[in-house]
Amino acid sequence: MKAVGIVVEYNPFHNGHLYHVQQTRKKTSADCVIAVMSSSFTQRGEPAIVPKWERARMALAGGVDLVVELPYPFAVQTAEWFAQGAVSILDALFCEQLCFGSEHGSIEPFIKTAQLLVYKKEQHNEKVKQYVRQGINYAKAYALALYDIGHDTLDVSQPNNILGLHYVKAIIEQRSNIKPETIQRIVAHYHDETLPVNDNIASATSIRRFLQVSDDDVARYVPHTTYETLQTYRHTYMTWHDWEKYFPFLKYRLLTMEVDDIQQIAEVEEGIEYRLKKAIIHATSFHDFLSAVKTKRYTWTRLQRICTHILTNVTKKEIAKAIESKRATYVRPLAMNETGRAYLQEVKKHMTLPLVTNAKHMRHDPIYQIEKKATQAYVSILPEPLCSEALQREYKTPPLR
C-alpha cells in the first residue's frame, strides 16, 4: 500500500481541510492518507477548541485513514521543530509523500529555498542574529535574512508557506525518502477572522471565533460530522476550550511563581519574565494580558506559546531532553478506519519507532511525560466528574475506529 502524509491541527476540521484531503489523495494516488495531528495545544500556543479524540473522529469522517498524535514537545513549537517532529513520525510510518497546503502552490520554490537554508545555515543564522539585535522580531528577521542569502526565494511571510518550507527542510535534514508535494490553498486565508458570505470555505480562526457566538453560523463551513461532533461536545461539557477559560489558571501560576522559576520555562528569554510578572497583576482577561506584554520582539504567537508552557509547567530543560534527537520517540495512533488498520498491519514489523496504543506503555518516555502534563492542564477547566473522566480517557482510550 502507498501512503501519503499530511500534517494537521483540525481546530476544527472544516471544508478547506476536506478539500485538502481529497486533493491529496487525487494528486498522489495514495491508498492511505495518514494525518499527524497536534494533540491538546496548537503550534500557535492555543488550546484546541475540542480534544484530540473529537478532532480525530472528524478527520476519519473527512476521509483520513489514519490519525496519529504529534505530541506537545513538537506541537507547541516554532515551525522548525513542529516540522521536525511531524516528518520523523511520517518517515517512521514509511510514507512515500508528504502533501501540504500552501499559498504558493508549486513545490519547486520550497525545495530550492529549503536547500539554501540547509547548506547556508550558518550564514542565515548570523544574518538573523544581526536583525534581531536591531530590535526586529524573529519572524521578520528570518524572512529578511533569507532574502539576503538568496534573493529569489519563497515568500515566508505567509504562514502555510513557512510551515511547508520547514517540512521540506526537515525531510532534507533527516535524509528521509519522503517526496514533498503541495496544493494551493483556496479562498480563506489562515488568519481570516470573518466568515465569507459567498463561499463555504472559511478559516479555522473565523470558525472558532463565531462558535463563541452561535453554532448555527458555522454549519455551512464544516462537514456535517464536524458540526455534529462540535454540538455533542458543547452539549456534554458545556464549554469550548479557549484561552479565556484558562486565564484564571494562568494567572494563579504567574502570581505564585518567582521570577527565577519563570526564567526556567520553555521559550522565556531576554527578561520577558519581568513583563509577564508585572502585567498579570492588573490583567482581567487573557487578551488584555497579552496586549500589555506584547513587544516588537515578542509576537502574539510566541507569547501564547510561552503562556502555554507556563500553564503546563514545561521547562527549557524538559523540552531540550525530549527533543534532543529532533525526532519523535514513538508513534501513537488516535483513530483509524479499515484502510488505516490494514496499513499499520503491513508496516508495523518494519517500523523503527514503537507503535503505542496504550498510554501506560509510555510512562517513562520524556516526550510523553510532557504530553501527559499538557493533557492534565487541558482538561482542568472541566467540572467534576467530567475532568476526571477526561483524564481517564487519555490513559485508557484505544484508537477510535
UniProtKB/Swiss-Prot annotation:
EC number from the UniProt entry: 6.3.4.-
UniProt entry keywords in alphabetical sequence: ATP-binding, Cytoplasm, Ligase, Nucleotide-binding, RNA-binding, tRNA processing, tRNA-binding
Group of enzyme by EC: ligase
GO molecular function: ATP binding; ligase activity, forming carbon-nitrogen bonds; tRNA binding
DNA-binding is among the record's keywords: no
An individual GO BP term: tRNA modification
Catalytic activity: cytidine(34) in elongator tRNA(Met) + acetate + ATP = N(4)-acetylcytidine(34) in elongator tRNA(Met) + AMP + diphosphate
Gene Ontology CC annotations of this record: cytoplasm
Stored HAMAP family: TmcAL
Protein name per Swiss-Prot or TrEMBL: tRNA(Met) cytidine acetate ligase
Protein species of origin: Anoxybacillus flavithermus (strain DSM 21510 / WK1)
